[in-house]
């Protein structure tokens, strides 16, 4: 069974590029791609490129979809009226977030079935931004979670969650790249569930975990030192 879904992404976001790469490998082909071209997108793209510095970066969107008849639309803001009208006209069953700003209710109301996100951290324990860095600083396990989107920040029902095995050879940058891949794989699993019927739903306990902003530089450096010095508690080797 095919799934009619729209793929939303900030322009050339490396997280979204990896997700689209894996979706296409699994024959999960979006009906359309809507990329946001904005200063916010530029900042977020550079932020993730820094987090993945020295790691292999997926091809650009144009290369990934070369030879495929996937329409690509550009908007100034995924939350604006133009984007909403575009999505309403397409009537997707599902919106897939492949690295976006926080999406507002006016957009979340458009898909007939759901909006799905893949969070680069283990929910419900670490919501919000920079989960890899926070997990290192707080000495917590690394992983990813695919979940339905609700009006909160990373609070929607969980579809699938998986820990990432951390090796002593890992770096902060390699963990970010590996978690981008894991997140993308979980998104592919989630869309396969939806294409075949319904996906699992595990409600989150809102009293568990915390919602965090971008990690301050000094705390991030402490997390990196913990990993580099072998003081991280969750190695698999």
Residue locations for each model-derived region?
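One-carbon transfer enzymes
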Residues: 1-237
């Amino acid at each position: 069974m095919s799934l009619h879904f729209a793929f939303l992404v900030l322009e050339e976001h490396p997280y979204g590029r990896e997700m689209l790469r894996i979706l296409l490998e699994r024959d999960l082909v979006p009906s359309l791609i809507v990329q946001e071209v904005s200063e916010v997108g530029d900042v977020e793209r550079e932020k993730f490129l820094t987090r993945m510095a020295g790691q292999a970066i997926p091809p650009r969107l144009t290369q990934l979809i070369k030879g495929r008849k996937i329409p690509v639309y550009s908007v100034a803001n995924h939350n604006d009226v133009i984007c909403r009208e575009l999505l309403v006209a397409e009537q997707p069953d599902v919106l897939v977030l492949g690295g976006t700003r926080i999406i507002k209710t006016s957009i979340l109301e458009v898909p007939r079935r759901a909006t799905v996100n893949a969070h680069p951290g283990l929910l419900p324990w670490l919501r919000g931004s920079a989960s890899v860095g926070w997990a290192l600083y707080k000495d917590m396990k690394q992983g990813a979670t695919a979940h339905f989107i609700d009006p909160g920040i990373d609070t929607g029902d969980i579809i699938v969650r998986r820990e990432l095995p951390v090796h002593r050879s890992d770096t902060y940058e390699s963990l970010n790249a590996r978690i981008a891949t894991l997140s993308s794989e979980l998104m592919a699993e989630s869309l396969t569930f939806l294409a075949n019927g319904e996906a699992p739903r595990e409600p989150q306990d809102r009293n568990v975990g915390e919602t965090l902003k971008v990690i301050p530089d000094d705390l991030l450096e402490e997390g990196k030192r913990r990993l580099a010095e072998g003081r991280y508690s969750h190695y698999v080797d």
